[in-house]
């Protein structure tokens, strides 16, 4: 399975930490030292997870050699949907008039991208598809509560899209060596560590310490697992693209793995926690740099709990 191309979309509205002083009493210094976040992007009133997904696909088509007509599978991922019936994947299918293909949306919180890719892998293995469009989008600010001093300041919005094929389509395609996912609902605070109950309240981080501990442990564990399983060592890894939940989590994982800051892709300072989109944006923004290496890994942890990793190699 190969990653052919990737692109992302960020809303134009930028929210600095100063905004939250009036909302939840937290200063810029307090937020930055504890999260690593300085600014984040916020969707405009006429934007949502679906519209941002469409914009990400538009950007993808601008830079890709693949026509949308080649797609025979669309997988969408989000935990902040605009519509739970007319889902992200269906809206993308409609907007770009992609006929007679399967369109599926998935949610495993911040792990949704890796699960979406694993679903693609399954369709390819069953010979039910050859070319997939994977789209992830998060409208976190539509669900977050700015006055929440525990989590209101964490979230940012954005979307990303990628073409994935069963066979290599170009010399610069990146090959998926393996994808691993894991449900962790029975670990720690599992299903209640982070919550979003639309009929009741917005995004809540009820057990932040529990999330922190398990995110550090499982992102480290699954990264080691995917490398070892495929005969690689940490020293072989050129770049790590971790979920952008908190700079302390990112630094902890990198330290446990023994990976330098130079090899760790970070965008949380500018974008906040963009949920399941964060690693896709990290790859999209740093694609030229990543392609100069040989081996890189996406590693994630999500509410629920869940974790996942994808190991890829370039064509060097």
PLM-predicted stretches and their roles:
Residues 3, 31, 60, 71-74, ...:
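Buried hydrophobic positions in well-ordered alpha/beta secondary-structure cores of metabolic enzymes
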Residues 50, 54-57, 80-81, 99, ...:
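Claisen-condensing/thiolase-fold acyl-transfer catalytic domains that form or cleave C-C bonds
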Residues 1-45, 148-213, 217, 221, ...:
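Condensing-enzyme catalytic core mediating Claisen C-C bond formation in acyl metabolism
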Residues 199-268:
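A contiguous, well-structured pocket-lining segment that forms one wall/lid of small-molecule binding clefts
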Residues 7, 77, 107, 132-138, ...:
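Short beta-strand segments
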Residues 123-158:
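Flexible, glycine-rich active-site loops centered on histidine and acidic residues
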Residues 24-33, 83-97, 130-140, 193-196, ...:
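Acidic-glycine-rich active-site phosphate/pyrophosphate-binding loop
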Residues 3, 45-108, 229-250, 256:
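Conserved beta-ketoacyl condensing-enzyme motif
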């Amino acid at each position: 399975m190969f990653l052919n191309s990737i692109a992302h979309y960020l809303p134009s509205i930028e929210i600095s930490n100063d905004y939250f002083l009036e909302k939840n009493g937290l200063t810029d210094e307090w937020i930055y030292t504890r999260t690593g976040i300085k600014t984040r992007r916020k969707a405009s009133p006429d934007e949502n997870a679906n519209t941002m997904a469409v914009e990400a696909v538009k950007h993808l088509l601008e830079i890709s050699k693949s026509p949308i007509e080649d797609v025979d599978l669309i997988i969408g991922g989000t935990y902040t949907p605009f519509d739970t019936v007319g889902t992200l994947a269906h809206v993308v299918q409609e907007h770009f008039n992609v006929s007679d293909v399967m369109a599926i949306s998935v949610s495993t919180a911040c792990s949704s991208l890796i699960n979406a890719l694993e679903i693609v892998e399954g369709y390819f293995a069953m010979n039910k598809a050859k070319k997939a469009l994977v789209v992830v989008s998060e409208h976190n600010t539509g669900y977050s509560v700015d006055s929440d001093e525990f989590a209101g300041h964490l979230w940012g919005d954005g979307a990303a899209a990628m073409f994935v094929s069963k066979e290599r389509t170009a010399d610069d395609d990146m090959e998926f060596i393996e994808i691993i996912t894991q449900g962790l609902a029975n670990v720690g605070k599992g299903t209640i560590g982070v919550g979003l109950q639309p009929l009741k309240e917005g995004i809540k981080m009820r057990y932040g310490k529990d999330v922190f501990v398990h995110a550090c442990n499982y992102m480290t564990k699954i990264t080691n697992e995917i490398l070892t399983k495929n005969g690689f060592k940490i020293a072989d890894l050129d770049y790590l693209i971790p979920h952008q939940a908190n700079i302390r989590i990112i630094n902890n994982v990198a330290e446990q793995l023994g990976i330098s800051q130079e090899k760790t892709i970070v965008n949380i300072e500018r974008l906040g926690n963009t949920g399941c989109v964060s690693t896709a944006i990290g790859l999209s923004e740093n694609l030229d740099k990543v392609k100069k290496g040989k081996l890189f890994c996406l590693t994630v942890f999500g509410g629920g709990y869940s974790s996942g990793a994808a190991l890829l190699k370039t064509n060097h």
